[in-house]
A protein has these predicted regions:
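Ubiquitin-like/PB1-type beta-grasp interaction modules and other compact soluble beta-rich domains
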Residues: 1-79
Length: 81
């Protein structure tokens, strides 16, 4: 599956996206654990629950079961005026 990063998350990962094997993770929660291992700086943002996850362009809950063809996007909080 493809994981896409946006805004300052790209600065943490130093890339726009990753390709992750579907055998693990199987849910968004498991994906977060996997990403924490790859990018330890993300952990504090996951703990603060400030990042939003979209699967195939729809926001989802953390217990959603993922499929190999899914595209996951991770968004930081949005502000504006």
């Amino acid at each position: 599956m493809r994981i896409r990063y946006f805004a300052w998350i790209k600065d943490i990962t130093n890339k726009d996206d990753d390709i992750i094997d579907i055998n693990h993770p199987k849910t968004i929660e498991e994906l977060k654990q996997n990403l924490e291992n790859l990018y330890p700086e993300l952990k504090k943002h996951f703990l603060q629950d400030v990042l939003r996850f979209a699967v195939n362009q729809e926001y989802v809950s953390e217990n959603l079961k993922l499929k190999p063809i899914d595209e996951i996007a991770i968004f930081p909080p949005v502000s504006g005026g």
